[in-house]
């Protein structure tokens, strides 16, 4: 099973990706995680990527395809994989097609923009552990302090409202074209994947079950 998982920033697709990975025993390939690891390394490339993300822009197609190509060649992808964060553009989709990557399903977790903005701007992070809180939906016991260590929580630099709105604008523009691209796939060597749209403004368990119900119809 080969899945592309779509969802705007804050839609909860990262959570769903982990659940799908465990349910179907397929590899979760998150370009976001791989990019964050590169940034954390402090390398020249990492610094360049940080500037791009802080501005609310997208990472280059060339870089994304390179890391995905390397990743899907690993043995744990033999049973299938879930692509999280790629493809985001038509050129990325075309490059995947050239690599012979056939996709079975496109699953989009859909949440209204106003709810996404509220979700993202309220996020607070404990840098050392990665623990995530929310000022409204999952507040720490003490405001702006990690529950376990008592250390200060931070807001990611790209979680401010202006940057979030820019990211959503880019996402919608790119995703609409991407879905049309796959719906109109004419490659003789590639089957047309099934497009599934899921309401993401529900409990995590309900979103997961809706996804499973659709995938199990195959």
Swiss-Prot record:
Binding site for AMP: 31, 36, 57-59, 92, 156, 167
Amino acids binding ATP: 10-15, 123, 132-133, 202
InterPro entries membership: Adenyl_kin_sub, Adenylat/UMP-CMP_kin, Adenylate_kinase_lid-dom, P-loop_NTPase
Stretches for region LID: 122-159
Reaction equations catalysed: AMP + ATP = 2 ADP
Enzyme class label: transferase
The enzyme's E.C. designation: 2.7.4.3
Highest taxon listed in the record's lineage: Bacteria
Keyword presence, Disulfide bond: no
Keyword Hydrolase: no
Location(s), subcellular: Cytoplasm
Gene Ontology MF terms: adenylate kinase activity; ATP binding
Keywords for the protein's UniProt record, in alphabetical order: ATP-binding, Cytoplasm, Kinase, Nucleotide biosynthesis, Nucleotide-binding, Transferase
Role: Catalyzes the reversible transfer of the terminal phosphate group between ATP and AMP. Plays an important role in cellular energy homeostasis and in adenine nucleotide metabolism.
Family under the similarity heading: Belongs to the adenylate kinase family.
Name of the protein described by the UniProt record: Adenylate kinase
Species of provenance: Francisella tularensis subsp. holarctica (strain LVS)
Upper classification of the organism: Bacteria, Pseudomonadati, Pseudomonadota, Gammaproteobacteria, Thiotrichales
């Amino acid at each position: 099973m080969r899945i592309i998982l779509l969802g705007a920033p804050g839609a909860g697709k990262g959570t769903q990706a982990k659940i799908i990975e465990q349910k179907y025993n397929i590899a979760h390939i998150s370009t976001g995680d791989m990019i964050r690891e590169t940034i954390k390394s402090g390398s020249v490339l990492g610094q360049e990527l940080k500037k791009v993300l802080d501005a609310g822009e997208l990472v280059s197609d060339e870089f994304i395809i390179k890391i995905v190509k390397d990743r899907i060649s690993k043995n744990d992808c033999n049973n299938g994989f879930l692509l999280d964060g790629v493809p985001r553009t038509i050129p990325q989709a075309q490059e995947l097609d050239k690599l012979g990557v056939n996709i079975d399903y496109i699953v989009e977790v859909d949440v209204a923009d106003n709810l996404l903005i509220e979700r993202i701007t309220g996020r607070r992070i404990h840098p050392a552990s990665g623990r995530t809180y929310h000022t409204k939906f999952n507040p720490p016991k003490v405001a702006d302090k990690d529950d376990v260590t008592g250390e200060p929580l931070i807001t990611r630099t790209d979680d401010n409202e202006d940057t979030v709105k820019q990211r959503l604008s880019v996402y919608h523009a790119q995703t609409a074209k991407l879905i049309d691209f796959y719906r109109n796939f004419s490659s003789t060597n590639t089957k047309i994947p099934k497009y599934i749209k899921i309401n993401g403004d529900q409990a995590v368990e309900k979103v997961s079950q809706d996804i499973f119900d659709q995938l199990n119809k195959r």
